[in-house]
Amino acid sequence: MVVVLDTVSANPVRPRHPEKVNRPDALSPPKPDWIRVRAPNSRGYADTRRIVKENGLVTVCEEAGCPNIGECWDKKHATFMIMGDTCTRACAFCNVRTGMPAALEASEPEYVAEATHKLGLAHVVVTSVDRDDLDDGGAEHFAQTIRAIRERCPATTIEILTPDFLRKDGALEKVVAAKPDVFNHNLETVPSRYLTVRPGARYFHSIRLLQRVKEIDPTIFTKSGIMVGLGEERHEVLQVMDDLRSADVDFLTIGQYLQPTRKHHAVMRYVTPDEFQGYETVGYTKGFLMVSASPLTRSSHHAGEDFAKLQTARAKLLR
């Protein structure tokens, strides 16, 4: 865990990533043509941004610099990020602000539910920063948000993307008891890259977290994702697939890592669209109900459409 607090300046202006300020620049190769996206400028994008701001909400779409924000917000699809905009971890790949977070906003679950209603979402995705500073890692806040959405928008299906609740006994059980439709927790990368990419996390703890969800409530769909282009080998990606299937995970996403700033981990290489297609094919042969693998695949991209496909795939399996 990395927690940074400025106790010197009267009115401190903190850098977004203070722990990275003194690092040397990490240079990445130029982006290939298949990575480029259009700048967001549509009416739907503007409407979504207005609703998000009016409700005082944070989205991972903005905070993480997602390349799909224009496409998703044009369709009024947004991923709400609860518990503030500041994370207690300092992962080498992530653009979310790091440091000591503010206290939880007690009304936030209702604000998220109201924004879900205003956007007319049939499927909503809720994620969060890591909150190692809280006794339960924010689990009760997650559960309250799920319950608030259920009350305000009973027909809306709910997908959550959670932190790992490392060393937070009982936290996972609180979240699962609120019965989200999809429980997503991303592994982010292969085990050999954890010390440099995701040093505050533990690979097999994350695998066990996903496995426990299914043990507690087998009806909940489970989902996980990784980025490629961080120096991993193909055989390591295939091993991650096997580990996830051993935990009975239903849905795998694989996308290209893109460097947020030069202070973040460099892109080691750009994986080709054909390689992504190969990963998707192999993933299906290993038994996943859904696999989404492409350069611009992200955890919440097309989440609503993918949830419908998950339901169909499970129904076919149970016939």
Swiss-Prot record:
Primary subcellular site in the record, as a coarse category: cytoplasm
Isomerase listed as a keyword: no
Pathway: Protein modification; protein lipoylation via endogenous pathway; protein N(6)-(lipoyl)lysine from octanoyl-[acyl-carrier-protein]: step 2/2
Keywords recorded for this protein, A-Z: 4Fe-4S, Cytoplasm, Iron, Iron-sulfur, Metal-binding, S-adenosyl-L-methionine, Transferase
Top-level taxon of origin: Bacteria
Radical SAM core domain sequence ranges: 73-289
Gene Ontology CC annotations of this record: cytoplasm
NCBIfam families from the UniProt entry: lipA, PRK05481.1, PRK12928.1
Record's protein name: Lipoyl synthase
Organism (species): Nitrobacter hamburgensis (strain DSM 10229 / NCIMB 13809 / X14)
